[in-house]
Amino acid sequence: MAVTRKTFLLPVMLATLAAAPLSAHSGRQDYPSCNLAQQRALKAPIGGTIRDPRQAHIAMRADILQADIGTARKARRLSQAEAQTLWNTVARIHRDANRFVTKQGFLSAGETASYDRALDGVAMRVCR
């Protein structure tokens, strides 16, 4: 029985795939805030000072992002100055969202989209 080229290549290809890393970013730690689709779909509970579902969404995203900034800083992926700048940016976004809800009683879809884009920008800097 003759061994064909296809028969020989299949085991080699399977061995190569098995040895390949599962993630394209195997050398980099992925933080929860790096998954932007998942972050934009977050549903957070309402309670305490949080009175609006969109406000709760922004608050939860901000909390996750600030935790990831702290983790990235501890891992020395961010300098102290960069981590502080990013942390303050997230805190400002969270504070602004809370002010809107206090002022008008809710956070509109447009405002939420704007805050989500701003948080995405911070996340991209943490996840690079």
Where are these regions (language model features)?
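Short N-terminal helix-initiation segments at or just after the protein's N-terminus
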Residues: P32, A62-I64
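Surface-exposed, polar/charged faces of alpha-helical domains
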Residues: T49-A56, M60, A67-R117, G121-M124, ...
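Classic N-terminal secretory signal peptides
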Residues: M1-H25
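N-terminal propeptides/low-complexity segments immediately following signal peptides
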Residues: A24-T49
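Residue-level detector of functional hotspots within protein domains
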Residues: F8, G48, I64
